[in-house]
Amino acid sequence: MDKKQVTDLRSELLDSRFGAKSISTIAESKRFPLHEMRDDVAFQIINDELYLDGNARQNLATFCQTWDDENVHKLMDLSINKNWIDKEEYPQSAAIDLRCVNMVADLWHAPAPKNGQAVGTNTIGSSEACMLGGMAMKWRWRKRMEAAGKPTDKPNLVCGPVQICWHKFARYWDVELREIPMRPGQLFMDPKRMIEACDENTIGVVPTFGVTYTGNYEFPQPLHDALDKFQADTGIDIDMHIDAASGGFLAPFVAPDIVWDFRLPRVKSISASGHKFGLAPLGCGWVIWRDEEALPQELVFNVDYLGGQIGTFAINFSRPAGQVIAQYYEFLRLGREGYTKVQNASYQVAAYLADEIAKLGPYEFICTGRPDEGIPAVCFKLKDGEDPGYTLYDLSERLRLRGWQVPAFTLGGEATDIVVMRIMCRRGFEMDFAELLLEDYKASLKYLSDHPKLQGIAQQNSFKHT
C-alpha cells in the first residue's frame, strides 16, 4: 500500500465528516456523481441544505399537517418498504386500508354496504381523489346519455372557485369546466348561477367544502335542493361530488348538524385529504362512493388478495403503505372524541386570532374560523376606501422575516382586485404559538409605520394559496 492509499484510508476511517475530503467540494447538481462518498458526509451535505427550507411549523399558508407524533414516525419507518399496491404480498396492510375506507364511509354517512365493505380507496392526496371522483362522474353521465341515444362529446362540469386539480381534471379528461367566478359580494357558487350553468351535458356539480382561497364552506344543501327543482322542471338529473379536502375531517366532529355528505341523495362521491385535517402525514387522501352503483365497474381493476381478488381504482401505483398505516393509527388513537378535541382546539386558536387581529387595523373579515362557517382559517382584506399606509403584501413580507409564512394574494375570477391575507390554524399551532405570531404581527405593523418609505413596495409574492 503506497503513501497515498494509506492517506486515503486514514481519511476514510478516521477523519471527521467536516475534515473529510469529499465535503470540501460542492455537491453535484447537474451530472450524475462519478465517485462515492461516506454516508455520514452525504447525509451532512443534504441535511445542511434542508436548513434553507422554511420552518414547516411556521408555515401558515399550508393546509397540510406539519406535526406528527413519534409513533407515526415509527409506523412510517416500519412500512417504508411495503408497497401499497401489492395487496397479495402485504395482506394486513391491505386489510388496514379497507378498514380505513369503512371508517371514513361511516363518518360521512354512506349507506350500509350490501357486502359489508364500503366503496372507496386511499389515494396519494385529495387531488388524485378528485380525479377519480371526476372520472366516475363522467363515466356515469356517458352511460346515461348513450342509453338515451344522445351525443357524449361535450361533457361539462359545474363548480365554484376550485382547487387547481379540477382544472387539470377538465383538461386531461376533455371536460368543459364551467367555474362560477368569484365576484365582489359573491365569492362562492350560489344556486342561481349554478343552475344557469347546468344542462344535460353536465356530468356533475362540485361544491368545495372548504374553499382554498378563503376557508369558507360552499354549503352543498342549498345547491342540492336547487338541483332537485331543476330536475322537476327539466327532467335533467345531475349528480354531485363533494370536494371536502379540508372540511371532510372537520364538520363531522365540530359541526355535525351541517348536512353536506351522503345524507344528500345526489351526492355520489366525496373526496378529502387525510394529510390535512385527517391528521395523517403527507401523501394520504380518500375518495368514497355512495355505493357500488356509483362507481362504474369498467373503471375498476382486480388484483389478487388472500386467494381471491379485490377491486382497485387508482391513478398512482407503487408507493409506501406507511401513510395508510399512520392514518389508521390516528383513527384508533383519537376516535371521534379525540378528533373533536383536536379540531376544536384549532377553531379556538382561529377565533382568538380573528378577534385580536380585528383590533389592529381596518380589516374586513371573510372567514373568522367559526365551525359553522368553514375551516379553522382566518381570512381578511383591507376595508374598501381605507389606506393604513401599508399593503397586505408588505405585512406578509415583514412576517416572513421572522419565519412566518402568511400568504397575501389576490382572489380569482372577477375579484382579482381584492387582496386577502389568510392564516391557517391546525394541529400543532397552539394558543401560545399564536400569541407569538401576534407579537410579530404587531412588531411588523410598527416597523411599517416607522418606515413609511418602505410601505407599498412589496410585490405579490409566490405563495400558493391552494
Curated annotation (Swiss-Prot):
Which of the residues bear the PTM N6-acetyllysine?
K446, K453, K464
Listed cofactors? pyridoxal 5'-phosphate
Kindly summarize what the UniProt induction comment says about this protein's expression.
By acidic conditions. Expression is regulated by a complex system involving RpoS, cAMP, CRP, EvgAS, H-NS, GadE, GadW and GadX. The level of involvement for each regulator varies depending upon the growth phase and the medium.
Which annotated residues bind pyridoxal 5'-phosphate? S126, S127, T212, H275
Q: Which residues carry this modification: N6-(pyridoxal phosphate)lysine?
A: K276
Query: Which coarse location class applies to the principal site listed for this UniProt protein?
Result: cytoplasm
Return the CDD domains for the record. DOPA_deC_like
BP GO terms, sorted = glutamate catabolic process; intracellular pH elevation
The annotated consequence of K276A reads: Strongly reduces pyridoxal phosphate binding and increases stability of the polypeptide
Give this protein's Gene Ontology molecular function annotations: glutamate decarboxylase activity; pyridoxal phosphate binding
Q: What is its EC number?
A: 4.1.1.15
Name the reaction it catalyses. L-glutamate + H(+) = 4-aminobutanoate + CO2
Q: What are the subcellular locations of this protein?
A: Cytoplasm; Membrane
Keywords, A to Z? Acetylation, Cytoplasm, Decarboxylase, Lyase, Membrane, Pyridoxal phosphate
Q: Which GO terms describe its cellular component?
A: cytosol; membrane
So where does substrate get bound? T62, N83
Miscellaneous note of the record: Changing Lys-276 to Ala increases thermal stability and protease resistance. The unfolding temperature is increased by 11 degrees Celsius.
**PANTHER family associated with the record:** GLUTAMATE DECARBOXYLASE
Q: What does this protein do?
A: Converts glutamate to gamma-aminobutyrate (GABA), consuming one intracellular proton in the reaction. The gad system helps to maintain a near-neutral intracellular pH when cells are exposed to extremely acidic conditions. The ability to survive transit through the acidic conditions of the stomach is essential for successful colonization of the mammalian host by commensal and pathogenic bacteria.
This protein's assembly is summarised as: Homohexamer composed of three dimers.
Similarity comment: Belongs to the group II decarboxylase family.
* Name this protein carries in UniProt: Glutamate decarboxylase beta
Source organism per UniProt: Escherichia coli (strain K12)
